[in-house]
Amino acid sequence: MNDHVIYTQSDVGLNQFFAKIYSLVGMGVGLSAFVSYLMLYPFRENLISILVNQPMIYYGAAIIELILVFVASGAARKNTPAALPIFLIYSALNGFTLSFIIVAYAQTTVFQAFLSSAAVFFAMSIIGVKTKRDMSGLRKAMFAALIGVVVASLINLFIGSGMMSYVISVISVLIFSGLIASDNQMIKRVYQATNGQVGDGWAVAMALSLYLDFINLFISLLRIFGRND
């Protein structure tokens, strides 16, 4: 009887922790979507002007964005109060840079990619939480494959192969789908291993990881669905 009560309390605590992380992911994605919307519609002329006349603004934002990822991750793992604000600032800036990618695609393609990303995220999250198979090995393999994708993408910047870009996007979908599942399993295992004694900073760190999984999955699907746009 007591074991059942402890198990039930543990389940409730785990569900609450997942809810906290998913709410942070939702905040990040929502903020990115809002900023992208502003750039794509009310400030569309400014976006086009930057693309044509001041592309260095985009590249500068992308560099700052990369720095913020490491700063946010470091702050989160140290459990500092600054972790959440930095994550939200990063999400807003990412919405700005995403708008320069999204502007090249039809609205229906963007919605299709977003809804597909949400469906894959939901499905892989369930798999990650429910599966009893250890996914730590898969996680390492996905990160190794991700390095390969980055290298291939850099090479393709000079080659400009449409087919290579398509293959990279398909592989990226598989990689980030796997990372979504493994990240969710890691959240569950760390929570259980620490008996629920995990700080808010770690919740932000995992929210950032899942946010990046979702955004990169979305970009990959956008490129696949928008090949003819």
UniProtKB/Swiss-Prot annotation:
Membrane-related topology note: Multi-pass membrane protein
A Pfam family hit: Bax1-I
- Principal subcellular localisation of the protein: membrane
Record's subcellular location: Cell membrane
Q: Which CDD domains match?
A: BI-1-like_bacterial
- This protein's record includes keyword Nucleotide-binding: no
Matching InterPro entries: Bax_inhibitor_1-related
Name the family. Answer: Belongs to the BI1 family.
**PANTHER family associated with the record:** BAX INHIBITOR-RELATED (PTHR23291), PROTEIN LIFEGUARD 4 (PTHR23291:SF50)
UniProt protein name: Uncharacterized membrane protein M6_Spy0327
What is the source species?
A: Streptococcus pyogenes serotype M6 (strain ATCC BAA-946 / MGAS10394)
